[in-house]
């Protein structure tokens, strides 16, 4: 069963690189076999965090691992992990848009071409999640910077991701903080394009049903 990987794997034959941020945080990029030991961390964090608004996603660990292990073998995929000392506390993973497009339920590649955007030159950021206790340490920007550089070094000229937000939803927390200011600060803009995907979704009455969702597509050109 195909499912949409939510915003925010891994990867060519490169080993790992390390980029210090500020003590005690470090960003490391993993590819292919080097990424595999961290896939359970990624899968479980996705299940835990994406259960919350706005995704309300009911995850399955086996399905998560199957999808991550498949994506880990694709060309130019990369998993960037933020470490607090030696403990992983967040991640961002990227994949060429053309490799990821089968996860969408609508023809996103065709939509890009209609906008005169080149999907073959676009690197897609699938998920970014920071453990709640470690948010506010500039880790999101550092993770994006690391994988944007990785993508540019492999010839990609643009980057993209998707976001979902129900403006009025009974499960939306009163203190929910929109992330649009972060995306704009990273120089991404909404394209006006929409992607669609379906997943098991928590309902206000406590039930879980498979539901179709729409998401905004963001984009930017990568520059040195």
What would you call each of these model-derived segments?
Residues 130, 136-152:
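Conserved acetyl-CoA-binding loop-helix of GNAT-fold acetyltransferases
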Residues 43-59:
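Helix-loop element at the rim of GNAT/NAT acetyltransferase active sites that forms part
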Residues 162-163, 171-204:
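Conserved catalytic-core motifs of GNAT/GCN5-like acyltransferases
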Residues 25, 87-91, 123:
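Glycine-rich phosphate/pyrophosphate-binding loop shared by adenosine-nucleotide-utilizing enzymes
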Residues 93-127, 196-209:
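Conserved acyl-donor/pantetheine-binding loop and adjacent beta-alpha core of acyl/acetyltransferases
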Residues 56-84, 93-96:
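Active-site rim helix/loop that mediates acceptor-substrate recognition in acyltransferases
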Residues 8-9, 18-37, 44, 48, ...:
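Conserved N-terminal entry element of GNAT/NAT acetyltransferase domains
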Residues 122-125, 151-175:
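Conserved GNAT acetyl-CoA-binding A-motif
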């Amino acid at each position: 069963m195909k499912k949409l990987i939510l915003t925010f794997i891994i990867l060519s034959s490169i080993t790992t690189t390390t980029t210090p941020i500020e003590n005690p945080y470090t960003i490391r990029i993993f590819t292919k076999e080097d990424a595999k030991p961290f896939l359970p961390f990624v899968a479980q964090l996705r299940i835990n965090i994406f259960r919350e608004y706005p995704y309300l996603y009911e995850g399955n660990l086996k399905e998560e691992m199957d999808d991550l292990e498949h994506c880990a073998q694709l060309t130019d995929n990369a998993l960037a992990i933020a470490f607090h000392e030696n403990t992983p506390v967040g991640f961002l993973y990227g994949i060429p848009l053309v490799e990821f497009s089968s996860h969408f339920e609508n023809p996103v590649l065709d939509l890009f071409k209609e906008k005169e955007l080149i999907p073959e030159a676009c690197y897609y950021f699938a998920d970014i999640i920071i453990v709640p206790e470690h948010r506010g340490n500039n880790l999101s920007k550092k993770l994006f910077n690391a994988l944007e550089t990785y993508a540019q070094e492999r010839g990609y000229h643009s980057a993209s991701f998707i976001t979902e937000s129900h403006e009025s939803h009974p499960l939306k927390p009163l203190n929910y903080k929109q992330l649009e200011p972060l995306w704009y600060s990273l120089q991404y803009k909404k394209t006006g394009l929409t992607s669609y995907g379906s997943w098991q979704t928590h309902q206000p009455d406590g039930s879980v049903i498979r539901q179709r969702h729409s998401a905004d597509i963001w984009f930017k050109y990568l520059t040195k």
